[in-house]
């Protein structure tokens, strides 16, 4: 009977250590997601390129703000980045006090909402960037990336960061769900 009790007491510190490790991983993933969404918003928000057409006086300017889907992308990534920054203190609190159930549940709900927002924004922006690269012959939309290399490279790069943030948010949701299930 003593060995059973001893096994239970030795299991509690191990469980607490695992819970602390999960909380530290949660914090690290949140910091990386902040960097990813913020970099995506900044890269897209500062994207513009000017192309002289016939003379230096007639120019074509490509800016992210000309396309509503890209504007939505910048705003959505900024919102998700701000949320992730605001969630960092709660993530730190989970490291200190690992028994918090309700705050983890709140994080799961808001993480899922932010995942939906960044998914919608990334999908809308991906459609526009695809059209910029490939065009659409049936709709008579020409591909513009042959002329606007910098614009297309920056928009594509910001999409990569945003899709990376989507993966990180999925991992955060799964991590929080596993931490709740262990309790």
UniProtKB/Swiss-Prot annotation:
Stored InterPro entries: CASP/CASPL, CASP_dom, CASPL
Cellular location(s): Cell membrane
Function: Regulates membrane-cell wall junctions and localized cell wall deposition. Required for establishment of the Casparian strip membrane domain (CSD) and the subsequent formation of Casparian strips, a cell wall modification of the root endodermis that determines an apoplastic barrier between the intraorganismal apoplasm and the extraorganismal apoplasm and prevents lateral diffusion.
Membrane topology designation: Multi-pass membrane protein
Short name of one Pfam family: CASP_dom
Transmembrane region(s): 24-44, 72-92, 105-125, 159-179
Subunit structure: Homodimer and heterodimers.
Designated name of the protein: Casparian strip membrane protein 2
Coiled coil: none
Source organism per UniProt: Triticum aestivum
Origin superkingdom: Eukaryota
Positions in the Cytoplasmic compartment: 1-23, 93-104, 180-183
Similarity remark: Belongs to the Casparian strip membrane proteins (CASP) family.
Cysteine-cysteine disulfides: none
Keyword annotations from UniProtKB, A to Z: Cell membrane, Cell wall biogenesis/degradation, Glycoprotein, Membrane, Transmembrane, Transmembrane helix
Extracellular-side positions: 45-71, 126-158
Record-level GO BP terms: cell wall organization
Keyword DNA-binding: no
GO cellular component, one term: plasma membrane
Glycosylation site residues: 48
NCBIfam families assigned to the protein according to its UniProt record, in alphabetical order: A_tha_TIGR01569 (TIGR01569)
């Amino acid at each position: 009977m003593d060995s059973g009790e001893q096994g239970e007491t030795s299991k509690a510190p191990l469980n607490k250590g695992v819970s602390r490790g999960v909380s530290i991983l949660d914090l690290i993933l949140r910091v990386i997601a902040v960097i990813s969404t913020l970099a995506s918003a900044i890269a897209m928000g500062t994207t513009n390129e000017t192309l002289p057409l016939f003379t230096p006086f007639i120019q074509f300017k490509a800016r992210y703000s000309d396309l509503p889907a890209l504007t939505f992308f910048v705003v959505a990534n900024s919102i998700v980045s701000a949320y992730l920054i605001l969630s960092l203190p709660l993530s730190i609190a989970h490291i200190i006090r690992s028994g918090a159930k309700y705050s983890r549940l709140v994080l799961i709900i808001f993480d899922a909402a932010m995942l939906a927002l960044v998914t919608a924004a990334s999908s809308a922006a991906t459609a526009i960037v695809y059209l910029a690269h490939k065009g659409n012959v049936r709709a008579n939309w020409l591909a513009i990336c042959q002329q606007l290399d910098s614009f297309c490279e920056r928009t594509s790069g910001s999409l990569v960061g945003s899709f990376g943030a989507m993966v990180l948010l999925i991992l955060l949701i799964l991590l929080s769900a596993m931490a709740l299930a262990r309790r």
